[in-house]
Amino acid sequence: MNRKNDETIEKILPKNQTLDADREERPTVISPVPALINTFIALITSVLLAFVLLPRIPILEKGELATRTITAPYALSIESPGPDKTMIFFKVDKGEEIIEAGHRVTERAARILAEIGRHEGIGNRFQAYVGLAALVLMIFYLFYRDIRRYRPALLGDTRKILLLALLLFLTISVSQVAKQFISLIADKLQLDIMTIGFALPLASGAMLVCLLLDFHLALGFSFVVSVLLGISFQGDPFIPVYYFMGSIVAALSVIQCKKRTAVLKAGALTMLVNLLVIGCIDFYQGELLMRGLYDMAAGFLGAVGVTMIVSVTLPFFEAVFDIATDIKLLELLDPNQPLLKELVYKSPGTYHHSILIGNLAEAAAETIGENPILARVGAYYHDIGKIHKPGYFIENQRTVENKHDRLMPSLSSLIIASHVKEGVDLAREHKLPSAVIDIIQQHHGTSLISFFYQKAKELQPFVAIAEEDYRYPGPRPRTKVAAIVMLADSVEAASRTLYNPPTQRIQALTNSVINRIVLDDQLSMCDLTLKDLQDISGSFNLILSGIFHQRIDYPGIEYPGEHKRSDYQVKKHTEEKKVGAGRNKGETLNPVDETRAS
């Protein structure tokens, strides 16, 4: 798009418009209610995690293998029978080593552990519990600052914050349970706690966060989990490194995940990295071959566990938290989806119109850094409500006869507007993600169904016609992607009036449609900036220029109806000048077409 057309969008906006280029530089303001809820979620999660992570002294019997070094949590005196059956008292100092990892429990150690078990409880360890909870909360605060800086929109979405907290709690809790279960096997094989740590499938949490939210959050999630598990394994420096590297690779491997089977490949890559990291750790520590083989086997099991957990739980989290992952969205693009099949059979014109809008919306979304897959899916499904009354929309009419000619403008307006509500109902019936339903509901905003409004004024020139009665019910677009679909819809519909247009005319048409939508205050609820609008306009022009490229007439070939169609178009343009109305999605720039339009 040339500089002249770039400036057109800026000049037409009033200076008091909220849509301005400085919006991106404004500090993020979080509503008090979500902020309080987020704080409450963080406090509850930190308290629960502190309870889960609080070290518990295992009660081991004489001869059992200690999987970790155990020290006395506090000083105590113990009475024990001596060799001659006389009672002997001995003291244990706080922090004194009771049993070393990898050693068998002695009779003395067993008595100390039994005595500690009798006094164990939150009441006796309140200080440690409070300190651990405060530490967890501090780690959460660092994560919060990162989210506020790089993903501020997430803080206003309590549903996703709750999902993040739940995944964090489940990852740590499952690891603690799995650690106890694996310890039973390790006792038989005489393995130490590090080998147990290698077998825990903790990378599944980061992979789920990346799939359900995004990679940046998965990066912070991996850091938090690694630090907390470092506490759980009593400061072993290699365990956090192992978890962090495995989690990052697991998240990286699903950034471009397009199929559910891709999780298997991600699990295989995670396994290779696990084995590589384990090999480096064992080589550094000078471990023997047999110990190294056990560690490698543990790393392999951990990667297998990651794949199984993600494959089983991903559909569950998608459904419960209504998250539209790229995998789910790509499945919705399958032409064999029931709604798309019904659309192509009942409303073929609408279907092909939606495909073109999908091309425009995807390109525009990619240009401004939004989700292009969501934009295409939203475009494919935005007009599914036309399935019920396809003949009332211009793209599905194959004759000059217009059903609206026999209807009052008010009734025609209701029929045109009803496809939004009917589309939302169909989407909910087929359990489409809420992100797609929002696009369906918002793709017209509260725009005016201008042709029927003008027609009503002509039929009743002495009656005050309420403009609100001829507007779509809304709401206006709340997200950039919904706004992109609205713009693409209007631009694509308006472009149908063009015939072999030069590039400059396409640019002028695109800017005219976008400016009209902006001036109608349809974009004031989303975060589009002037720079975004310029980029969107440029991407539209590029796509439309490819569609309306110059064509030549082949000698000896006649095109039946060509001239008749051209005359018909000329007639429509003449009538349009009389009405002076433009298309506002649901209506074309051509007033005669508007009576039959979407």
Which ranges hold each PLM region?
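Short hydrophobic/aromatic-rich motifs at helix boundaries and adjacent loops
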Residues: A178-K179, F221-S222, Q285-L289, L332-D334, ...
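Membrane-embedded alpha-helical signal segments
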Residues: M1-L163, V209, Y345-T367, I373-H430, ...
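Juxtamembrane "helix exit" motif at the C-terminal ends of alpha-helical transmembrane segments
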Residues: A50-I57, I139-R151, I172-F181, L275-G286
